[in-house]
Amino acid sequence: MDLVSFFNPYLENVRTKKKTKSTFLRIFPRGIMHDGAPGLMKTLCDSEPRMFYQDKQYILKNDMTWPSLSQVAEKELRAPLKFHIYDASESLLFTDSIENIPFQYRHFVIPSGNVIKLFGKTECGKKVCINVFGQNSYFYCEYQCKKELNSRICSLLNSSEIKMSCSFSIESVTKYNFYGYNTEPIKNLFKLSFSNFYISNRIGKILLNEGVSVYEAEVEILNRFFIDNNLKSFGWYQINYLSIQEFAKSSNVEIELNCHVSDLFLLKEDSWPLYDCCSFDIECLSQNGNFPDAEQMVTSSLISVIDFDSEGNYQSKHLFTLGTCEQIEGVFIYEFASEFELLYAFFLFLKCKSPEILTGYNIINFDLKYLCTRMEKIYNFEIGGFSKLKRGKFSVIVPYEQHKKFLNSLTKVNMSGILCFDMYNVYSSKISAQNYKLDTIAKLCLNQEKENLSYKEIPKKFIDGSKGRAVVGRYCIQDSLLVVQLFTKINYHYEMAEVASLAYITIRCAVFEGQQKKIFPCILHEAKNLNMILPSMNTNFNKGKENVGYKGATVLEPKIGYYATPTVVFDFQSLYPSIMMAHNLCYSTLVVDENAVIGLHADDILTVHVGPVTHRFVKKTVRESILASLLKKWLDKRKEVKMQMKMCNNPVMEMLLDKKQLALKTTCNSVYGVTGATHSLLPCVAIAASVTCLGREMLCKTVDYVDSAMYSDTFFIEKFGLTRGDFSGTFGIEVIYGDTDSLFVTFKNVCPKALKRIAPSIASHITNTLFKHPIKLEFEKILFPLILICKKRYIGKLDDATLVFKGVELVRKTSCDFVKVVVKDIIDLLFWDVDVQKSAEKLSNMTIQEIYENGVPDGIQKIIKKLCDARDALFLNRVNIKSLVLSSVLSKDISAYKQANLPHLAVVKRLAQRKEELPNIGDRVMYILIAPTETVKKTFHNYELAEDPAYAIENNLKINADKYFEQIMKAVTNAISPIFPKTGIKKEKFLLSILPLKVYVDQSFCDLTDVL
């Protein structure tokens, strides 16, 4: 190994201390030398790091060939070369590097210049890195004099603020402001082009802070590259001239080429090459048995790697282990004497295998972060060179705010030329589960039971000799194999590739960045085609309006109750995008300068009143909205893709098309949110406020039309062809709830079958009568009967006998199974038992006095009996403790919680005290409420009673029946309170008052009575 000094914070006091010989710190479990011995050992080693594989010893070196990986035969490259790119990164080159660059590209990097690196595969499967020269960074600004501007830029380049030099040019240009309707170009506008993206961004910000009107200063060089050249971040390319970088390569891949931007040709093909993927998992040992902390005295004991391709085809299985390990069938096993050697070999393997995709389960928040921290902080070893670039990046990035609050959901990964897809993050965002542990998700999504090895057993097995390490190794490999199956099941990589291609961004950006980073480049591209430019943050016309609040779209408070008549639910299709399209809302149509609309007729302008503020937009006859044209293009494309899906017979192509239409849908729905975010790249509260205001007006119009025009049965007979036989009494119609993009309309005395037949026609009639294209009201479902509890909470029965639950305890993850079963049983009575239905309707119309005199209707006694049975089961200890498990998400580190007295936090603290396996951030923490051991206190808080379920079962702890019955009463009240009489009594108190009283005595009291 080249002379490298390893810094050990435990043994060294001065980081700059020199060693005359290469050394590295050896940390390893004592058990790999003496079977069963606990603890870790550490020592300095001055021999070369090595690996043992199939009874042979290999010296670990950066340029080594990995023994178990087959070498691909080299093929002669010929122009034209066809290749597929999947990733890109920006870099800078300086004058001191020009001797390694072909002559024709040198002037682009004197004194410094941008180089775009494209990563991909050739048509024959060779890995390739393309160095693209000639892409400038630029922005625009308003300045009185070109000469003065030139002088200012030169001054900045020579100042201490920049500390770098580059070539630049200034030219006068004619462009229009994207923000605000206008007919005149921006005056005194100049385009400033720089060969160095860092300097361009820096100078743009400086001018912006000085009060200069600046445009597009925040546009990233990769966005410029894709948009300016109309290229895609993911797809097939062709290059007709080959300039091969044979010496002084900057990459670790087989082929490195140089080209100019103009040499790239985008091909129209949707297929994928087979990309190499690796799924990995690590197991760690800590000295004290606590959860591993990468900066403390711990060691990585095992790393499993599954090598597969992007279609899920397995290639090989690999296991990196400390100490000897008994052979595992079909697995390449590499043995090491210390953790550093194991980690070094793992990174060497990644470099040799050079996968395009790295995946695992919770690898961003633990595995990758742990590996990077160990190598950088414990071993003082730079790992960026193990990516696709020799001077690349291989890091886990924790934003400052996150580091401060320990909010791991924002953690990002940057590996040059390697995409990272963490299946934990993917599945926790895509599906609903009680918890997101790998075994839970495997059971739910793959219908597979994971062979479990408890957290406490792993260290014992590992130090128990080569057989024990093989057990842990199989467990580790099993996890990696499950991840491969999860990876190929959800095909998230295809979805992100479509998002990236659509938005002119890299896949890495699509995975780790928010929606504004995806929408902004799309707007930029569309504006560029219309010769418009986007103002930078401080120059927009939103100033002074950021704090203007605007209401959400809820327009009609729910008329809470139990509805034993059919309720039709109508839904607006893509409401917010369709409003923007119908009313021509856009940055470019917003009136911000009254002089610009002088001469326009009043009919050419849409006026929207949002509280005390008025917003005005020019109509399509004057200027078409760029946002509307973007949305139309995306929605039309989505329709086209869905049609292709119907005609597609190839399952793989159908899946790719599905991911494409999903990407289009997500992007459309994100546009509104980007305009309303005041801290986005291009905020515009005027658009967001106008959209919600127009949405409210639409809902109000619909309610008024239903009340004024659709109130009689004659209307439905004449318009929709119903007959008198379809009515069973006096007709009635009422809008009982309107929220965001839905309407709930109840119909009295109409045949449900006839109503379902005409419901789509009703939606079409309202659409054609009230709304502008493309706004469309659609029939969604009929609920009969319906319990409308409050906003966004209801229970209803579909015509196929399926119950629909929205926002009730039955579907909440925090509730325990026993509570859910009781609530479900009672709800079933209300929806399936005719006697209970009639009694519920009667009860809802009774007064409290009538109940005192006559009691509740007979059918309600069935509900009361269910509650009494549940109470008996709890107090008489008949409930399985597993069905009483509650849960809450550990959303951040315990120290970041302002309220420390929460039940799940108390359980985590108890687990830590007992040195049990701790949950990861983002996991659901399971707990039960146990009976108090002390009897002095009258009341106990839940956090005082919360305990780990496994510990409670193991120690035969009693449950707290009172607490669980309280939960049942609250849950049942929340679910069925609309059937209660309208009284001033609290709902829960009313339900409790109709239950018969019962006293439960302790067994010790029974024993005492026997004695007496």
Swiss-Prot record:
Localization per Swiss-Prot or TrEMBL: Host nucleus
Tagged with keyword Transferase: yes
Catalytic activity entry: DNA(n) + a 2'-deoxyribonucleoside 5'-triphosphate = DNA(n+1) + diphosphate
InterPro entries per UniProt: DNA-dir_DNA_pol_B (IPR006172), DNA-dir_DNA_pol_B_CS (IPR017964), DNA-dir_DNA_pol_B_exonuc (IPR006133), DNA-dir_DNA_pol_B_multi_dom (IPR006134), DNA/RNA_pol_sf (IPR043502), DNA_pol_B_thumb (IPR042087), DNA_pol_palm_dom_sf (IPR023211), DNA_pol_type-B (IPR050240)
GO cellular component: host cell nucleus
UniProt superkingdom: Viruses
Keywords: DNA replication, DNA-binding, DNA-directed DNA polymerase, Host nucleus, Nucleotidyltransferase, Transferase, Viral DNA replication
One Pfam family this sequence matches: DNA_pol_B_exo1
EC top class named in words: transferase
One GO MF term: DNA binding
EC number: 2.7.7.7
Gene3D superfamilies referenced in this protein's UniProt entry, alphabetically: DNA polymerase family B, C-terminal domain (1.10.132.60), DNA Polymerase, chain B, domain 1 (3.30.342.10), Helix hairpin bin (1.10.287.690), Palm domain of DNA polymerase (3.90.1600.10), Ribonuclease H-like superfamily/Ribonuclease H (3.30.420.10)
Gene Ontology biological process terms, A to Z: DNA-templated DNA replication; viral DNA genome replication
Membership in a protein family: Belongs to the DNA polymerase type-B family.
PANTHER family (alphabetical): DNA POLYMERASE CATALYTIC SUBUNIT (PTHR10322), DNA POLYMERASE DELTA CATALYTIC SUBUNIT (PTHR10322:SF23)
Name of the protein in its database record: DNA polymerase catalytic subunit
Highest classification ranks of the organism: Viruses, Duplodnaviria, Heunggongvirae, Peploviricota, Herviviricetes
Name of encoding gene: U38
